[in-house]
Amino acid sequence: TRLNAFLVKTIFENLADDRIITDYSKIPELTKPVTIGAGYKPDWSTDYDAMIFAKVTGAEELIELSNIAHVYDKDPKVYKDAKPYDRLSWDEMLQICKGPWKPGLNTPLDPLAAKLGAKNRQKVVFLAGLENFKNYLDNKSFVGTVIE
């Protein structure tokens, strides 16, 4: 995840803080609009790391940028009739992300991260693709799922 963080940081150039945060107990003063974090503790998912990071920094929203733009009612790689969601409440998200967490679990967020996000009422946006991400940042129409 640290290599991915470095690659993502290069995309943001001057918008991102120079440091990649890897220890959420020692967060420096954040002076730029974008902060990149990477894996924190062994056996924690990157989803959970991101939720901790958002809480500690007071982030207004957390963006889950991946190769799948939406949260679906079931795995779209397995089920051709999977339906995407544009918006979900945290109660709805907790129904999708239930069960015990284990590495490689195929849910939009790991269940522990989903519980933490719900507890903190964290806004989370699922997006795919850099152009789509740019549209979201520019307040233009985008494809994705917003959880609040």
Predicted regions: what is each one?
Residues 1-148:
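C-terminal catalytic "cap/lid" subdomain
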